[in-house]
UniProtKB/Swiss-Prot annotation:
Record organism: Haemophilus influenzae (strain ATCC 51907 / DSM 11121 / KW20 / Rd)
Post-translational modification: Phosphorylated by PhoR.
Protein name: Phosphate regulon transcriptional regulatory protein PhoB
Keywords: Activator, Cytoplasm, DNA-binding, Phosphate transport, Phosphoprotein, Transcription, Transcription regulation, Transport, Two-component regulatory system
PROSITE patterns reported in the protein's UniProt record: OMPR_PHOB (PS51755), RESPONSE_REGULATORY (PS50110)
Main location: cytoplasm
Record's subcellular location: Cytoplasm
CDD domains per the UniProt record, alphabetical: REC_OmpR_PhoB, trans_reg_C
Function: This protein is a positive regulator for the phosphate regulon. Transcription of this operon is positively regulated by PhoB and PhoR when phosphate is limited.
All copies of domain Response regulatory, residue ranges: 4-119
GO BP term, pick one: phosphate ion transport
Amino acid sequence: MTRKILIVEDECAIREMIALFLSQKYYDVIEASDFKTAINKIKENPKLILLDWMLPGRSGIQFIQYIKKQESYAAIPIIMLTAKSTEEDCIACLNAGADDYITKPFSPQILLARIEAVWRRIYEQQSQFIQIDELSIDENAQRVFFQQQEINLSSTEFKLLHFFMRHPEKVYSREQLLNRIWHNDLEVEYRTVDSYIRRLRRNLAPFQCEHYIQTVRGSGYRFSSYLRDKQ
């Protein structure tokens, strides 16, 4: 799934700060500074919207009301960003259909945590199918495909790839992978993690997608579709 976020914010400095920060966290960002532009940008199918309350012309609340009436876009989650901080404002925002509410000023790290929490709630818990580029996983059937060609993996290799694709662009140490995949089995050593990483890459290699599993020196491993980090 494309990690595309629409930022609707009329203050240029704030909008550009958020856009730069999220781009560094591997989100695709599109921007709008007013209601009319946001309506046009929504056609680019963002998966989440960061929305300022006070916009030129019409308000963020009116934007939410408009979106919720559009069948194609009604399910897109919305996080409201605003200087309005009263209890009544928060209730009005959430009742209008926003999924979360953050008051200005805010920490970029808090914003990121809120985005990821909404993302997990809306997408990860509902989805039984993960796709990044042309590599996809059917969670229910425990099958992996690249361009509709099935890739045969062992149970452990599948668990490893599934975990990585659930958490793209994040670096995990061998210890963390032991905990997540092998649940701290005392008989499993760090070398076992390295061995399964090699096996997984070997099985992905015939499909030219082994580079998704990347080594981060001194830290561990990550899943990334960015070719600049190709092994």
